[in-house]
């Protein structure tokens, strides 16, 4: 028998799913006052959903730079080849409030082109 307690448990579990997705995909966790403006080679990268990711080294620390979803990257003209390891990019990004080595890119410059990611 489906009781009120079962209903409340199910409703609580289902309501947590959008919050978890928002925590990952929402940009409120990034501090627009803490900007990274860095030019350097890509150490490694992923070009896959939920979003592309660059890994770059600055002052001996590996930084994780989250990009837009691949559909947006493609629509804006940023290919997997553009962010391949060894490519030199300029990245303008905001620091994550909880992890100082994670950033969200606002834009990247590659081969003289600036690609806005928002």
Identify the role of each PLM range.
Residues 97-118:
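OB-fold/S1-family single-stranded nucleic acid-binding modules
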Residues 4-8:
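N-terminal export leaders
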């Amino acid at each position: 028998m489906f009781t009120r307690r079962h209903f409340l448990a199910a409703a609580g579990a289902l309501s947590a799913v959008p919050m978890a997705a928002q925590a990952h995909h929402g940009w409120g966790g990034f501090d627009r006052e803490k900007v990274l403006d860095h030019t350097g080679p890509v150490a490694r990268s992923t070009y896959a959903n939920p979003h592309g990711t660059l890994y770059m080294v600055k002052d001996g620390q590996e930084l994780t730079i989250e990009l837009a979803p691949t559909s947006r990257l493609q629509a804006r003209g940023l290919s997997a080849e553009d962010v391949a390891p060894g490519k030199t990019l300029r990245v303008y990004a905001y620091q994550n409030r909880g992890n100082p080595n994670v950033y969200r890119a606002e834009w990247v410059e590659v081969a003289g082109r600036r690609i806005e990611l928002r």
